[in-house]
Amino acid sequence: MTQTASERFLTASPANLVAGDFRPLAGGDGDTIQSVDPASPDDVVFESPTRRGDVADAVAAARSALPAWSGRSLEERVAVLRRWQELTKANADRIADLIVLEMGKVRGECLFEANALGGKVDITLGPESLSRVTDYTVPVNDSRDGDCRFKPHGVMAVIGPFNFPAHLPNGHWVPALLTGNTIVFKPSDKTPATGQLLAELMQQALDESGAPKGVFNMVQGAADVASTLTADPGIDGILFTGSWSVGRRILEANLDHPGRIVALELGGSNPAVVMPDAHLRQAVIECARAAFATTGQRCTCTRRIIVHEAIADTFIPAFCRTASNLLVGPGDSTDPVFMGPLVTEASAREALEFQSGLVGAGGSVLVQATSLDRPGHFVTPGVVQVDRFTVENDTECFGPIAQIAIVKDLDEAIEQSNATRYGLAASLFSAERATFDRYFAEVRSGCINWNTGTAGASSKLPFGGLGHSGNHRPAGAFSVDYCAYPVASMVERGGAAAPPAGMLVEDGWFDA
């Protein structure tokens, strides 16, 4: 890491956090990781070897801290999260600036992400979420009650993504800590400095509360460290956000651990359908926002736009003009930039190769995605019209390339929406509730929106997908479900029970 970046954002040099102490990464035995400014790739933000050996120590520290942490009262754990909330609010600009520098998206979005960290605490402590892990008692019969109480899973591995390097892992560890789990966090190797800043703030919150050392740990690294972490026998659960290919490998590696929860929030090939009675201006704005927000680097971005033939000649040119006029530039620009650079040079190359592949398969370029003639991983929006979508050719492109297909009716729109292995988000634009209700009933997706884009989500609601998009709802309001498990107890309250028929028990056997 450059000295400038270190001085501006981090307290410690590049390090892992193990049992409350930051261990310098210098001289480590793991793969070297590096992050650069995507708008100015010659500027290195973070560069260091990693330490695979720290993974076992971090898991052991989390295991050691678990009894004391889970044994604390709910109020004590809430107090730590409230302090975390205060620290993230006080450091929101610092967090946002570092995300811009390391990930590249526009600063307004980065600041929104930084402010959402504290909001997740409020949501998790709200009745819609907290009620899902609140103990309760029910009468079972005349003499017995049934208790339901919740226990933490134990040591949870949280593996974060690069596109929302603060918000998404925070969405896992806030409910996990609340319910008494301990954490080993591995940030994306594309945003390690952001991960370390969050770890520094979390450790400060824990230290100020007198929490046990090892409640929250962090290990930096790439695939080698992630594989070591997810294979560690001391892990009780894995909360992962990332691609289908990596999520599949994690799931396969845990087939012999049926008791270990593996919650995967993966990618999407998300459709948006525009019907003839839609408000077309609204549909254009929402589809463009959802397709190109974060330079196409959201799992909920609209990848496939399905347009009814009756309005195709109006919608498609308007959408293409909107895409062509989106302002692309550095995330910290004072201009009203909509899209920043892609996170890596490889990401930029893959987006352009994806566009070429669509053309090679018969697609027609309506808006040509190109690299900007300037330093940085900048790619302009692309729009490609295809004849139809098929499961066989369905691929998630994590970049600013939108595909458009024309359909003749709602039946075909539903069929085309379902022509995917994914099932994360979908949108329908129509004035009729009945049209949306049918679309909702027949489309396979975890999030189905009406007259708003696929990229809109709220932590107050469940979030997750089907198929290649994931296996649980580890984000949003239902995230607590995957951080604690219910335990049932039958409680006799009526004293000595009468023996059942066929069993003889004499009172005299128990005389002193």
Whereabouts are the PLM-identified features?
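Short, well-ordered beta-strand elements within core beta-sheets of diverse protein domains
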Residues: V45-T50, S64-G71, V158, A272-M275, ...
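Long amphipathic alpha-helix in the N-terminal Rossmann-like dinucleotide-binding domain
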Residues: A56-A60, A68, R82-D93, K105-V133, ...
